[in-house]
Amino acid sequence: MKLSVFTSVLLAGLVAAQQEKLPKCAQPCVDQYTTGGGVAGCGQLDIKCICSNKNFLSGIACCLEKECDAQGKETAVKYAKQICATAGVTDLPDDVTCDKSAASSGTASGTATGATTPTSSDSTNTASATGGSSTVEPNAGAREGAAGFIGVGMAMLLAL
């Protein structure tokens, strides 16, 4: 029990210290790709997975391009490079570049079933479709792309 409390206090201190390095403009971008159980489809503490996730990185870059000024972007890049280097990922871009084609791609899935019923002998048919659904994952398009590496470090901040 004491170990859990100690670990929680230690992690809270680390998060607070690291948040000072994260530009405020980047926080909405990080929030967009962070869930309770992970970051962009990776485990919360799987830094290598997050830093290597190209579409996710592109999506974060597009968000940062909209949200941050030049200083904020520079700070976010530096922070992300530091975090990713700890996992051995060093092939990150030096600046924020939004690859809209990678960031806007997504996945969609759905099913539709139909039934036709003749309504008269003159071959007039009535069709009805039921059960159609479509699900678009907003984070899926952001999971693999080259330019948005910045969000990795920021996402790790929230994951801690």
UniProtKB/Swiss-Prot annotation:
Residues 102-135 have a biased composition (Low complexity). Residues 140-160 form a propeptide. Disulfide bonds join 25-68, 29-63, 42-49, 51-84. One of its GO terms (cellular component) is extracellular region. Residues 18-111 form the CFEM domain. InterPro entries: CFEM_domain (IPR051735), Extracellular_membr_CFEM_dom (IPR008427). Pfam families: CFEM (PF05730). Residues 1-17 form the signal peptide. SMART domains: CFEM. Keywords: Cell membrane, Cytoplasm, Disulfide bond, Glycoprotein, GPI-anchor, Heme, Iron, Lipoprotein, Membrane, Metal-binding, Secreted, Signal. It is a lipid-anchor; GPI-anchor. Suppresses host programmed cell death during infection by binding to Z.mays WAK17 isoform 2 and Z.mays LRR5, to prevent activation of Z.mays WAK17 isoform 1 and the downstream hypersensitive response. The CFEM domain mediates interactions with host proteins. Belongs to the RBT5 family. Interacts with Z.mays LRR5; the interaction is direct. Interacts with Z.mays WAK17 isoform 2; the interaction is direct. This is Effector CFEMN1. The gene is CFEMN1.
